[in-house]
Amino acid sequence: MPKGTEPTMPASSYSGVQALPPRRIKVIGVPLDLGASRRGVDMGPSAVRVAGLEARLESLGHEVNDGGNIAVAIAETKHVGEHHARYLKEITDTCTKAAEMVEHALQDGMTPVVLGGDHSVAAGTVSGVATFYRKQHQKIGLIWIDAHADLNTPETSPSGNVHGMPLAALVGLGPEPLANILGFSPKVAPENVVIIGVRDIDITEKENIRRAGISEVYTMRDIDERGMRTVMEEALRAAGRGTAGYHISLDMDWIDPEDAPGVGTPVRGGATYREAHLAMEIIADHGRMVSFEIVEVNPVIDEHNRTADLAVELISSAFGKKIL
């Protein structure tokens, strides 16, 4: 067929070659914004759903069950609490609910896909995954894809915003209520934690990386110099070593604001559109992802839902969509 005469596909149709066996996927919305100072990420799960997540995943042969949203507290009805860890009680309560839902999804043989919400929800998501595999005497790996390290604690945080603390909680540095969700800490061994794409990191977070014993940290400079494929191959090997598989925690501010404008804490110099897709495609190629979450989509400051649309595209790539 000559170029330019191809039939136009309906807007609701998607093409893609499946690289993964069909999965049963459980979508869990966590519309939490108490961990961030900028409001709006509580609408992230709805924006991602409106962008066609379910149809995209089903077009790849996966079975999708949407569990709806977890009920969360709103700032207008709660006291901020300790200013060094704002709304910590409410965030811990929400993350505990998320952890339980994620664990139940895995018990039912489903792959959890969690939609945030700010990045504090990861303290719940990863706790649920770690609990499920711990009961089988197995460990998990963690791929943390983010412009920020999220390794602050109440003692080091300049803002008191808990969305800057979830990775610290997961490796056992605190805050203690988040670190001990479902009764144990740490959730992930430091040798199986990989941070990718960081480019805005506090001095105290650098110290906490060393304290925690995390050695696999790839900055945007590493990606620039060595390429996304090399970085991802090394990262997945480290996260997968001696584990049942790994959780993917993707903060949309990892991507350059030119392509993902609808995030609460944008940082120039992020991953390009194609770099982000390549990272997800390599994750799909390896086939060892046990759970996935995408966070910090903020429709209030987005441009025509571009960031949510991209979030759906990236989830699709992580679940097997290919160009050819």
Residue ranges and their predicted role:
Residues Q107-I181, P190, H286-G287:
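Active-site histidine-anchored catalytic micro-motif
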